[in-house]
């Protein structure tokens, strides 16, 4: 029996955002703190190095993890080392940081929070700068006004000694102005969550960076200077925890993610109005576009394309138009008239969406690089024959996708938000194979996440290559539909108007909507025969047994 208290660096709740739940060695061990009792620094599978190696597809303790595919960027340390609360090493934090700016003023608001420290003062932009706050001691918080600019620095000074305890840089962002911001979905911070920044070591850092063949003893491949690091005490000489600069050699700077760099002005598009929306008419869209720093001219953008899809019961119409040159300025807004009309037989409500980006210069540490600054895609439902617009049902919440993927951005990074993806990945969308494979959203996402457990695999052929998802391993429990679904959208029966899926590589095509949802995961012949015998040309009878509250309801057969 020992009195040792494990460090609180990464919480179980954070692990369970993907692992759902974390459970190893017969499911007995279910927390990082428990795991680290055995996987301690005396072993070649010490926990910190082991976890880094597993998630970065490396090697640890003689085990090869090269087949592991991490669902987001491995450089984003705060996916696991979730921050946002004061620690002993960093007693002052700003929430949010970066501060949200959606009005183009370049100025935001944040809340400063501090831990239990003795008498102190907080000054602006210099050790003797303008006084912001002064307290005799203890934890607390104070909101700033709307004057935070990129690079605002708060100095936390000890009033007794006059020494600066911490310098905190706060920036601004436009991420989150339209939808849930990439990277905003984080776990629960541990009490020592900044340990990754203030305790660099050769073993822990090398467990991720072993692919570059760094030899700390000789200095080989350890920077262009071949720096020798005989022990961990030398790491902090170059790799200070945090400098306030992006993409430098500080621990935080070296792991700065491009998508939330303060150097990106952001692209904020707001749909103001859609008119001329009767069947057969070409819609007219009024919109605004700006960055955190001010207005943007559409013609100057690298890309700005509007999407119209519908009807919102389930999409089978899709049009995409470049709006940059055709937009006309009216006051502070812009107006674009679609060239393509709505179908003559259009009914109900339709949806307007977009994809857009700028290319901007970013100082990435040792060079200026042109990088994409991508807009978050707003969506707007508009009425065609409905009295008022009826949005498409929400099947999944993109925040749940981001819980594991953190910055889910596909097709060059410009397609974000699962509820925008469905505007293109509709029931009739297929790849270029012969016969074709469905890339309908539910069929595709179910199959990708089922991966190696599929009986028949899943391969998508596109013009730029063939993509085989048959070896993917889902890190959680696939029976937990709520990991992705919202509003009981996985329950049967599905709403009226949901369309069949074109599935030419499956047993028959099209596959009726309820069967398509089930057979995309349960892809064996037995399941297909069962679905087929309970389907007729005019409908499905799945809900007779699998409906909500029935003896074999979706919840019951997926109980976990």
Per-region residue spans from a language model:
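Membrane-embedded alpha-helical bundles of multi-pass integral membrane proteins
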Residues: 206, 212, 233-236, 242, ...
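Low-complexity, acidic Ser/Thr/Pro/Gly-rich terminal tails and inter-domain linkers that flank the onset
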Residues: 256-279
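Short amphipathic beta-strand and strand-loop transition segments with alternating hydrophobic
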Residues: 94-101, 271-277, 325-328
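Acidic glycine-/aspartate-rich tracts in secreted/extracellular proteins
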Residues: 84-85, 213, 241-243, 525-526, ...
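A eukaryote-biased signal for short, well-structured alpha-helical docking elements
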Residues: 229-263
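Extended surface/linker regions that mediate inter-domain or inter-protein docking
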Residues: 1-86, 174, 184-202, 210, ...
């Amino acid at each position: 029996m020992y009195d040792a208290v494990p460090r609180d660096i990464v919480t179980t709740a954070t692990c369970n955002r993907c692992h759902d739940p974390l459970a190893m060695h017969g499911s007995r061990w279910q927390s990082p703190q428990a795991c680290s009792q055995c996987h301690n620094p005396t072993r070649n599978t010490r926990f910190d190095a082991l976890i880094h190696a597993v998630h970065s597809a490396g090697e640890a303790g003689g085990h090869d993890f090269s087949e592991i595919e991490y669902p987001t960027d491995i450089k984003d340390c705060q996916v696991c080392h979730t921050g946002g609360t004061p620690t002993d090493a960093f007693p002052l934090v700003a929430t949010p940081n970066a501060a949200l700016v959606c009005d183009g003023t370049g100025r935001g608001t944040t809340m400063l929070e501090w831990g239990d420290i003795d008498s102190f003062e907080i000054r602006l932009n210099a050790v003797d700068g303008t006084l912001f706050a002064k307290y005799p001691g203890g934890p607390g918080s104070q909101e700033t006004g709307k004057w935070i600019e990129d690079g605002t620095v708060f100095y936390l000074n000890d009033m007794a000694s006059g020494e600066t305890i911490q310098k905190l840089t706060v920036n601004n962002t436009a991420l989150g102005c339209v939808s849930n911001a990439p990277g905003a979905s984080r776990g629960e911070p541990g009490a020592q969550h900044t340990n990754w920044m203030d305790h660099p070591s050769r073993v822990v850092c090398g467990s991720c960076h072993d692919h570059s063949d760094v030899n700390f003893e000789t200095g080989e491949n350890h920077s262009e200077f071949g720096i020798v690091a005989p022990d961990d005490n030398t790491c902090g000489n170059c790799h200070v925890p945090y400098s306030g600069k992006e993409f430098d050699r500080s621990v935080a700077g070296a792991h700065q993610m491009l998508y939330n760099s303060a150097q990106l002005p952001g692209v904020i598009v707001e749909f103001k109005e859609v008119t001329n929306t009767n069947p057969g008419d070409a819609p007219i869209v009024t919109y605004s576009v700006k960055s955190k720093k001010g207005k943007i001219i559409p013609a100057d953008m690298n890309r700005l394309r509007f999407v119209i899809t519908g009807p919102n019961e389930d999409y089978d119409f899709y049009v995409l138009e470049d709006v940059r040159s055709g937009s006309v300025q009216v006051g502070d807004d812009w107006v674009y008239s679609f060239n393509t009309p709505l179908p003559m037989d259009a009914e109900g409500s339709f949806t307007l969406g977009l994809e857009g980006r700028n290319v901007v210069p970013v100082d990435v540490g040792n060079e200026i690089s042109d990088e994409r600054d991508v807009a978050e895609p707003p969506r707007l439902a508009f009425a065609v024959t409905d009295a008022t617009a009826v949005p498409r049902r929400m099947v999944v919440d993109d925040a749940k996708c981001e819980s594991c993927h953190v910055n889910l951005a596909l097709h060059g990074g410009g397609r974000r938000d699962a509820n925008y993806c469905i505007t293109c990945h509709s029931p009739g969308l297929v790849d270029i194979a012969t016969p074709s494979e469905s890339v309908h959203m539910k069929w595709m996402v179910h199959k990708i996440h089922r991966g190696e457990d599929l009986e028949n695999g899943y391969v998508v052929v596109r013009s730029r290559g063939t993509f085989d998802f048959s070896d993917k391993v889902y890190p959680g429990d696939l029976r937990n539909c709520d990991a992705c679904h919202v509003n009981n959208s996985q329950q049967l029966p599905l709403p009226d108007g949901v369309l069949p899926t074109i599935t030419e590589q499956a047993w028959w095509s099209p596959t009726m909507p309820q069967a398509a949802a089930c057979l995309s995961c349960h892809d064996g012949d037995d399941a297909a025969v069962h679905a087929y015998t309970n389907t007729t040309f005019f409908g499905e009878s799945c809900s007779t047994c699998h409906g909500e509250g029935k003896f074999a309801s979706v919840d019951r057969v997926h109980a976990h």
